Regions:
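FAD-site-proximal beta/loop scaffold in flavoenzymes
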Residues: 48, 53, 59-77, 175-227, ...
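Glycine-rich Rossmann-fold phosphate-binding loop(s) that bind the pyrophosphate
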Residues: 85-87
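Aromatic/hydrophobic pocket-lining residues that form π-stacking "cages" and hydrophobic walls in ligand
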Residues: 1
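Redox-cofactor binding/interface segments in oxidoreductases and associated redox assembly factors
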Residues: 37, 43-44, 83, 175
Length: 246
């Protein structure tokens, strides 16, 4: 996609926006390197996975901890894998992981899943999937790779230490406990829902004239690459139409 935009003359600038003034006809974005002005802007800053919240998480990202099954499942072929979460995404990704891992254990802080009934039924019927109820991941560790995990039962207060099979050398831990919209400096400039996602209409307009939002950063029911691309196309067409009025 990057190369495609270059073919059409798009300019790419690497910068971090630290402030946004969106109330005027000309929108002003202040970055660490420069200041940018435009009559229209499209906010497409995405969303990122909510951290699992355990000690050692940062150290073992990419060394056993992942937040994307479709990206990393292949690395855990024939290994044991754990999934933190209990919603639709967690259970769907657990089901996907069973195509690669020899065993998948869902760790959920409640005593029942929050996923849709149809998805739950598939998980309960899958012989590769096990469950750790009323539990949260407290700490992870290892010798360069994820090899040890401490899980706490929040009802009993009991701690369980889980270790990788010696012949495997590691296990996987996937976090699917929600996403956080990457609204940054735009959070208090446009209308958002109670989770921080930007509200738009079907044409990607926000409540601020000349400001659009596309992709995972906006309120929507399905967050996938295909829907983000569609959002971007719609927003771009709307910007083009608005500019043709001048």
């Amino acid at each position: 996609m990057y190369e495609q935009t270059e073919q059409f003359g798009a300019e790419h600038v690497r910068d971090t926006i630290t402030n946004a003034e969106l109330s005027g006809d000309i929108k002003v974005l202040t970055g660490e390197k420069d200041t940018y002005q435009a009559k229209n802007i499209i906010i497409a800053t995405g969303a990122y996975a909510r951290p699992i919240g355990c000690k050692g998480e940062q150290e073992y990202k990419g060394r056993g901890i992942s937040y994307c099954a479709t990206c990393d499942a292949n690395f855990f072929t024939d290994l044991e894998v754990y999934v933190a979460g209990g919603g639709d995404a967690a259970v769907e990704e657990a089901l996907y992981l069973t195509k690669f891992a020899r065993k998948v254990t869902i760790i959920h802080r409640r005593d029942e899943l929050r996923a849709a009934k149809s998805i739950q039924e598939k998980a309960f019927a899958n012989p590769k999937i096990a469950f750790l109820w009323d539990s949260v991941v407290e700490e992870v560790s290892g010798d360069g790779l994820l090899q040890t995990m401490t899980v706490k039962n929040i009802k009993t207060g009991e701690f369980t230490k889980i270790e990788a099979d010696p012949k495997d050398g590691l296990f996987g831990l996937f976090g699917f406990i929600g996403m956080i919209p990457n609204t940054g400096v735009f959070a208090d400039k446009v209308e958002t829902d109670d989770k921080g996602y930007i509200k738009t209409d079907e044409d990607m307009h926000t409540n601020v004239p000349g400001v659009y939002a596309a992709g995972d950063v906006r309120v929507k029911s399905l967050r996938q690459v295909v829907t983000a691309v569609a959002d971007g196309a719609i927003a771009a067409v709307q910007v083009e139409r608005s500019m043709s009025d001048y």
